[in-house]
A protein has these predicted regions:
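DE-rich acidic low-complexity regions and acidic surface loops
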Residues: 1-219
Length: 219
């Protein structure tokens, strides 16, 4: 919680009261920002929480322009691959690549925060033939990274056209917290943990309970 935090919404009165008591004692500035959510719609629906989590757990992150990112996380490092996809918004190929990379520079910085990715990160932007385009993309990327509260450092383009960067590890990534290795594919993929699935089911039950008056739920 810092000066940029506008509000903290909590949909449980019990948890709200506990956090309020805690914040008044240890974090007085945060107490005024706590809000008890009393709306009819589940708070995750209101803020598209499930959709955002699903996007942050997926390998592919699609953009409105048609371009997309492919994010792969391994034990050693994380790679981010930029692709044009169906983007046809520019007059020529160079402009298409430039616009896609510029949009990706903003999206990558956001995905690093959402997924809480740390350690060594390799970004493979689409090859650009013009030096000024590379400089503008790198400047935009560093500008977006500067907004991150976690320490990040980004180098320039390597001879292979890759950007190497590091982001300080503060805790486990989102995928490591919510997922576990997939046994069906020998650990090459990931699936949600039993706890994560249980929370999904609970939110769905609450969603249905607010619309109907069922006598029981069978799972």
């Amino acid at each position: 919680v810092n000066e940029d935090t506008q509000s903290i919404r909590i949909d449980s009165r019990e948890q709200h009261d506990l956090l309020l008591q805690f914040s008044r004692e240890f974090m007085p500035k945060a107490a005024d920002k706590l809000q008890l959510y009393k709306g009819e719609r589940p708070i995750f629906d209101l803020l598209s929480g499930d959709e955002e989590i699903a996007r942050a757990l997926g390998r592919r992150d699609d953009h409105k322009s048609g371009g997309y990112l492919v994010v792969d996380q391994t034990e050693a490092l994380t790679t981010v691959d930029v692709n044009t996809g169906g983007y046809v918004g520019a007059r020529n190929f160079d402009d298409t690549v430039f616009k896609t990379n510029l949009e990706a520079a903003q999206a990558i910085a956001r995905q690093l925060r959402l997924r809480n990715l740390g350690g060594i990160i390799i970004v493979d932007f689409i090859d650009m033939s013009r030096d000024d385009h590379r400089e503008q993309v790198l400047a935009e990327f560093r500008k977006q990274l500067a907004r991150d509260r976690v320490k990040t450092t980004a180098g320039g383009f390597s001879q292979l056209g890759l950007v190497e960067m590091t982001r300080k590890r503060t805790r486990e990534s989102l995928a490591h917290m919510l997922c576990e290795p997939c046994l069906a594919c020998g650990g090459q993929g990931i699936v949600k943990t039993a706890r994560s699935v249980a929370y999904d089911v609970l939110r769905e039950i609450l969603r249905e309970a607010r619309q109907f008056t069922p006598r029981e739920f069978r799972i």
